[in-house]
Each structure stands twice: as structure tokens, then as C-alpha cells.
Design a protein with these regions (language model features):
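Extracytoplasmic low-complexity, Pro/Thr/Ser/Ala/Gly-rich segments
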Residues: 1-52, 58-62, 124-128
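Residue-level signal for the start and early helices of compact helical domains
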Residues: 35, 42, 54, 77-79, ...
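Residues that act as N-cap/strand-start positions at coil-to-secondary-structure junctions
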Residues: 36-38, 49, 59, 80, ...
Length: 128
């Protein structure tokens, strides 16, 4: 991975995110080929209903995205997890918010695994 190209890509994506907000959550991390990536989480002060969700990763490789959420009703916590293989070269990947459930959520988390080359990624979640 060319670090200069990666730094420019991250800077460009961050500028687009800053101009396109507001977002409920913006998650970002790097993934190393053949390793499980870190899980990144955004917790909300109050339950939120997600709208548009977009995932974008750097380069031409593929990565497996694990997207999860928790929703609390009274004392019951319901978790939802979705796994998708994403081709980074195809540009931003739109994710149907119904994959996180149809009720307001308390948090959203994302992790990547099975990257076939080193990459970095952004996930944005807009409100409904």
C-alpha cells in the first residue's frame, strides 16, 4: 500500500464527509491483509433510526465488512449483525439500513476481516 496515496485518499474522503454531513456516525479504521481488523463503535446518547449507510475502502482489493447494532427496549437488548464482502475498487457501497433493524438503535459498530490487501475504510450513517 502506498502510504502517500492512502493519506490523500483519507484526506479526500474526510473532506467529502465534512461537506456532506451531518451524520449520526462516522467510523474509520485500517485493515491489514489476512488479519481481523479492529471493531469501531459509535454509541448514541438516545436511540436513533438509521437512514443512509455507506461504506468505502481504499484500493482495488476486497474486504469482509461486519456491521452490527444494538437496540434496547426496556431491559431487553437486541443485537443485529450483517456480513458483506465489499470490492473496494467499486467505490462507495450503499447498505440498506433495514439490515440494522427497523427500530431505533443505541449503537452501531463495524469491523473488517479477510482483507486481501492492506486498506483503510470509512463508514457513514445518516439519520432517517
Amino acid at each position: 500500500m502506498d502510504r502517500a496515496q492512502l493519506a490523500q485518499w483519507r484526506s479526500d474522503r474526510q473532506a467529502e464527509i465534512d461537506a456532506g454531513g451531518p451524520f449520526l456516525a462516522v467510523l474509520s479504521s485500517e485493515s491489514t491483509a489476512g488479519r481481523e481488523g479492529d471493531r469501531v463503535v459509535a454509541a448514541f446518547e438516545q436511540p436513533e433510526l438509521p437512514g443512509a449507510i455507506a461504506f468505502e475502502c481504499f484500493g482495488d482489493g476486497t474486504v469482509e465488512l461486519q456491521l452490527d447494532s444494538d437496540s434496547t427496549t426496556g431491559t431487553v437488548i437486541t443485537g443485529t449483525t450483517t456480513v458483506r464482502t465489499v470490492d473496494c475498487g467499486e467505490g462507495p457501497f450503499a447498505i440498506d439500513s433495514d439490515f440494522l433493524g427497523t427500530e431505533p438503535i443505541d449503537l452501531v459498530g463495524a469491523a473488517t476481516t479477510a482483507a486481501d490487501r492492506d486498506t483503510a475504510w470509512f463508514l457513514t450513517v445518516s439519520g432517517a
